[in-house]
């Protein structure tokens, strides 16, 4: 999976898909009451990027629904995964449950259209800190209460805050989540980062019977040398400001026979058995 990073303006969706991304990440900004308002990162952000691009969240969902619906004029077959980077660290933890309710209802109304939409992308909820786990509980409670619990099959959880992996596992255990889990490791493209935690996550992913990590991705990669390093370690995905660079690396002799772009037929919740 090649995730286009910080795709917060509607016009950026096609831009990143044209560069080769098959997944996009966008930031969800909340008001003080936990209501999702806009797709927006803000300052600071990655080096060389404009931090202020944004869209109304519901309008963004309406557009991305079309982009991921077969036979729609806007349909782009390659886009199979949507990563919602939830900026919960900007609001009180006491509002995390309200935020989870709100995002679930907006996805129901504007993306899935309560069963009337054929939009098919998988959804990845990026939680910044495990202390915000009430968001996940609320999201799942809302799908159940609204009568659309089946959409859980399309939704995965990702911990994006570089926290202790065992601490993350403990919270997932509390929530009763033993599947559909991604693990991110990374840092803004402005800085270098070692591989110790990334290797630990990959080791846990590959441990038989360990159900708290199904996929691992590295972020935010812009240098080809770091992309190569991550691929050699065996990551499932790369988040980048430059998907075209990832495509070029994947075509290199060392990787061409080992990796390919994920399609809709690849289940993002299953561990890859090479």
UniProtKB/Swiss-Prot annotation:
GO CC, alphabetical: extracellular region
Q: Which InterPro entries match?
A: PLC-like_Pdiesterase_TIM-brl
Protein origin, superkingdom: Eukaryota
**Where does the record place it?**
Secreted
Q: Where expressed (tissues)?
A: Expressed by the venom gland.
Per the UniProt entry, the Enzyme Commission number(s) are 4.6.1.-
What does the record give as cofactor? Mg(2+)
- The top EC class is lyase
Q: Which reaction does it catalyse?
A: an N-(acyl)-sphingosylphosphocholine = an N-(acyl)-sphingosyl-1,3-cyclic phosphate + choline; an N-(acyl)-sphingosylphosphoethanolamine = an N-(acyl)-sphingosyl-1,3-cyclic phosphate + ethanolamine; a 1-acyl-sn-glycero-3-phosphocholine = a 1-acyl-sn-glycero-2,3-cyclic phosphate + choline; a 1-acyl-sn-glycero-3-phosphoethanolamine = a 1-acyl-sn-glycero-2,3-cyclic phosphate + ethanolamine
Query: Which of UniProt's keywords are assigned here?
Result: Cytolysis, Dermonecrotic toxin, Disulfide bond, Hemolysis, Lipid degradation, Lipid metabolism, Lyase, Magnesium, Metal-binding, Secreted, Toxin
> Where along this sequence does the record place binding of Mg(2+)?
25, 27, 85
Report the cofactor remark.
Binds 1 Mg(2+) ion per subunit.
Q: Name one GO biological process term.
A: lipid catabolic process
Q: Which SUPFAM superfamilies does the record cross-reference, listed alphabetically?
A: PLC-like phosphodiesterases
Q: Between which residues do disulfide bridges form?
A: 45-51, 47-190
Q: Which family does it belong to?
A: Belongs to the arthropod phospholipase D family. Class II subfamily.
What is this protein's function? Dermonecrotic toxins cleave the phosphodiester linkage between the phosphate and headgroup of certain phospholipids (sphingolipid and lysolipid substrates), forming an alcohol (often choline) and a cyclic phosphate. This toxin acts on sphingomyelin (SM). It may also act on ceramide phosphoethanolamine (CPE), lysophosphatidylcholine (LPC) and lysophosphatidylethanolamine (LPE), but not on lysophosphatidylserine (LPS), and lysophosphatidylglycerol (LPG). It acts by transphosphatidylation, releasing exclusively cyclic phosphate products as second products.
Query: Per its record, how is this protein called by name?
Result: Dermonecrotic toxin SdSicTox-betaIIB1bxii
Q: Which organism is it from?
A: Sicarius cf. damarensis (strain GJB-2008) (Six-eyed sand spider)
- Phylogenetic lineage: Eukaryota, Metazoa, Ecdysozoa, Arthropoda, Chelicerata
């Amino acid at each position: 999976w090649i995730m286009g990073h910080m795709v917060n303006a509607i016009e950026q969706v096609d831009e990143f898909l044209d560069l080769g991304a098959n997944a996009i990440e966008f930031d969800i900004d909340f008001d003080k009451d936990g209501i999702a308002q806009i797709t927006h990162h803000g300052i600071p952000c990655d080096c060389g990027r404009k931090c202020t691009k944004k869209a109304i969240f519901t309008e963004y969902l309406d557009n991305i629904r079309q982009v991921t619906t077969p036979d729609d004029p806007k349909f782009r077959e390659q886009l199979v995964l949507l990563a919602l980077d939830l900026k919960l660290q900007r609001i009180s933890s006491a509002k995390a449950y309200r935020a989870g309710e709100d995002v679930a209802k907006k996805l129901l109304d504007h993306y899935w259209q309560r069963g009337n939409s054929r939009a098919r992308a998988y959804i990845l909820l990026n939680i910044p800190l495990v202390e915000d786990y009430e968001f996940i509980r609320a999201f799942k409670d809302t799908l159940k209460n609204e009568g659309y619990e089946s959409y859980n099959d399309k939704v995965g959880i990702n911990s994006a805050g570089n926290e202790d992996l065992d601490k993350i596992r403990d919270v997932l255990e509390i929530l009763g989540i033993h599947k559909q889990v991604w693990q991110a490791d990374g840092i803004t493209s402005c800085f270098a980062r070692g591989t110790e935690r990334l290797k630990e996550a990959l080791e846990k992913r590959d441990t038989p019977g360990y159900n708290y990590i199904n996929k691992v991705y590295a972020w935010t990669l812009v240098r080809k040398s770091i992309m190569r390093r991550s691929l050699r370690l065996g990551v499932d995905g790369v988040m980048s400001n430059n998907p075209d660079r990832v495509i070029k690396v994947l075509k290199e002799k060392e990787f061409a026979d080992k990796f390919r772009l994920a399609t809709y037929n690849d289940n993002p919740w299953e561990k890859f058995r090479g």
